[in-house]
Every structure is written in C-alpha cells, then in structure tokens.
Amino acid sequence: MIHLRLMQEIHSITKDHFPPFLLPLLEIPEPPEKIYYEGMLPEKEEGVKVLAVVGSRKHTRYGKDITQKLLEGLRGYPIIIVSGLALGIDGIAHQKALDIGLTTISVPGSGIAYKNLYP
C-alpha cells in the first residue's frame, strides 16, 4: 500500500540541525521550526550551489525548450536543482536535471502527506 510506505519514510529535521543549504530559511520572518522530508537530503559539499527552477503547469513549447537548454548548460557543474513537484516546468526541470546527472530536490507546495499531493 503506497500510502503506508510513504508515511513510513517521512523524516523531519529541526531548525537547529538544518544542513547548510536550508540555513537561508532561518532568515525569513517566522521560519519553520521543522522540515519534513522523504528520502535522503543531499550532502552539501564545498562549492555546491542550489538553484531553484519553477514555472507554469501549462507551459508553452518555448518554456519547455528554454528550461531544457538552460539545464543542459549546467551539465557537469556542482549544482543541486530544487523545484516543485507539479506537472509542467517543475517536472521538466527535474527530468532534465536527472538526465544530465544532477541531484534534485522536490518541494511540493501541498506538503508531502500522500493525501495532499497534487500534481
């Protein structure tokens, strides 16, 4: 049963233990006390950058092409791609990043509880 499997793999981390790439969250008004995540958080090595890529669910052909070209230009660089988990540009960004060997982090706007996921 997928719902149970997902719930068993959800972890949390308190703000006192955020890895370096999450520390900017502490600079916003009312930062989160805890972050929930599934899977493994990537190791943040010296020189690795984190880049957010977001866009429309109802993208144009140009939007798709330019997203893929921009990410292709990052091939081989020490970059982690962060995007939503929505259909459209978010999904295109994740797929292209994975195709060229980059690490990705998905941040669904609806939270990670299975019943709340919305593409």
Task: Give the location of each predicted region.
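Glycine-biased, small-residue-rich flexible motifs in mid-sequence functional cores and linkers
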Residues: 2-119
